[in-house]
Every structure is written in C-alpha cells, then in structure tokens.
C-alpha cells in the first residue's frame, strides 16, 4: 500500500476501513474493533507498525514479545526469565522474526556461496527479472527446505557441495533455548528488512549491543533461474540476481507466533 492510499484509508469512515483491511487479509478486524487499534493496522498495512524484542520464556519455552519500553521497564530479575532470540518486525502486512546477527562460516567469516549451480529446484518458483510477483514471495521457509533437500550430498559443477547459504540459515540457533526453525528469507522479506534497515539497526544496537546489517549483499531463498538466485545490497537497497558461486551474507528469519508479554 502506498503512502497516499494509507492516508486515504485513515480518512474514510470506519465501515470502509474495516472492509479495506479485511480485503488486505486482516480478517480479525471487525466493526467492534476500537478505532485506535484500526489505526495501528492501517500503519501495519502501509508501512512500519513496530519492532519488538522476540524472547523465549526459559521456564516453558513459550515465545514472548516486548516493546523496547516494556523491556526497559522490567526488573533485572524479570529479564533473567527470558532469553532473547531476535527482533520481530511488523510492516507492510507481514510479521516475522529477524536473527540478531549474521551467520558465520567455518572460518569465522560472514559470507557463503549459494550452491546448487545448474539445478532448477523442483517446487521452487523461478522469478525472472521483471516478474510482477517478485515482491510478494511468501515461500521463504518452503523454498529453503526444498533447496537443502535437493542439494544434500551433491557437489555442483562449480565444486560447491550442498547449499551453504540455505544450510547456514536453517541450522542457525540464537542460544541454547532457541527451538525455532530459521530459514533463508524470501526476496520480499529481505527487501522489507532493507527498507527498514535503519530502524532495525537502531533497535539491535540498543537492545543487542550489535548485530547491525553490513552494507553488503545478502542472499534470499528466491530463485531466478537454474544458475542464479536473488539477493539484496543492503548498502544501497537494490535487488539483483547473482550467480550461485558468488559470496553473500546470510541473515536468518523465522515465523512469529503471537504471544503476549507477562
């Protein structure tokens, strides 16, 4: 949704607001929903709603979210009951958790080849340049899983074994309490992270003391063709398809499960 459409949605009557939000996929919105909450959803539809801490409650493994203000207000003893996973972003109708750091390779570096060169992955859609659906890709988890399964134990024609980038994301763990299944983000999720990079970086700096995005290329799980996949340059925000022998960074994401802070 554009900024202009967002502004128009704020000005129309409540019945039309509810109808428009329902059409965008927010089926939980009804005429009984408070206007203040509807305004939050309108912001979510058209831009950045919020960024929150995603934490695991150590006692039962449940996933809990805190705003920055809520986290600061907790006592030291209360904070010790939770283990931080990453940051949860809600923007442009989407919600997912972003790891608090990039993956590292076996040498301690931060870049990975994609792997699978020459393979047109089955059940993974190709998005050629100019494809109108490129920025509505919702299959990051499924595509990561398929890429790993189809490259397992195989060495491509460029001497890369497996799918290093996808495997790094899939095997990522934030800490000993982390039971989430992380994956290589879709091009849509990665572009969203790039769009709100400054806000995410500020949040990471404040609540994780680091882990900000580098101004380098990051791999997505979205395929271009049998020899290339999509990545995003965090330095200038461009999306491009690159050969799978290229090196790129990996920032895992995972699906969010809504839970209220206690």
Give the role of each language-model region:
Residues 162, 172, 180, 187-262:
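C-terminal, surface-exposed recognition/capping segments
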Residues 29-31, 177-185:
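Surface-exposed patches in mature extracellular/periplasmic domains of secreted proteins
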Residues 15-25, 94-101, 181, 187, ...:
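Extracellular/lumenal glycan-associated surfaces
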Residues 1-52:
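Surface-exposed receptor/substrate recognition regions of extracellular proteins
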């Amino acid at each position: 949704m554009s900024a202009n459409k967002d502004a128009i949605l704020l000005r129309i009557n409540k019945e039309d607001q509810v109808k428009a939000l329902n059409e965008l996929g927010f089926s939980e919105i009804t005429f009984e929903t408070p206007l203040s909450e509807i305004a939050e959803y309108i912001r979510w539809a058209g831009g950045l709603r919020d960024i929150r801490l995603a934490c695991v409650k150590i006692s039962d493994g449940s996933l809990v979210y805190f705003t920055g203000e809520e986290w600061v207000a907790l006592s030291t003893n209360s904070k010790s009951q939770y283990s931080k996973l990453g940051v949860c972003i809600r923007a442009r109708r989407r919600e997912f958790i972003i790891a608090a750091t990039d993956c590292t390779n076996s040498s301690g570096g931060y870049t990975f080849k994609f792997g699978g060169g020459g393979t047109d992955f089955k059940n993974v859609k190709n998005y050629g340049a100019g494809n109108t659906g490129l920025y509505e890709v919702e299959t990051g988890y499924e595509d990561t899983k398929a890429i790993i399964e189809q490259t397992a134990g195989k060495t491509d024609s460029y001497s890369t074994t497996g799918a290093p980038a996808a495997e790094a994301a899939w095997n990522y763990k934030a800490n000993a309490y982390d039971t989430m299944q992380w994956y290589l983000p879709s091009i849509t999720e990665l572009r969203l992270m790039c769009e709100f990079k400054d806000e995410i970086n500020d949040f990471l700096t404040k609540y994780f003391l680091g882990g900000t995005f580098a101004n380098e290329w990051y791999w997505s799980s979205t395929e271009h063709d049998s020899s290339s996949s999509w990545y995003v340059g965090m330095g200038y925000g461009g999306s491009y398809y690159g050969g799978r022998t290229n090196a790129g960074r990996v920032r895992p994401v995972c699906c969010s499960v809504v839970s209220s802070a206690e």
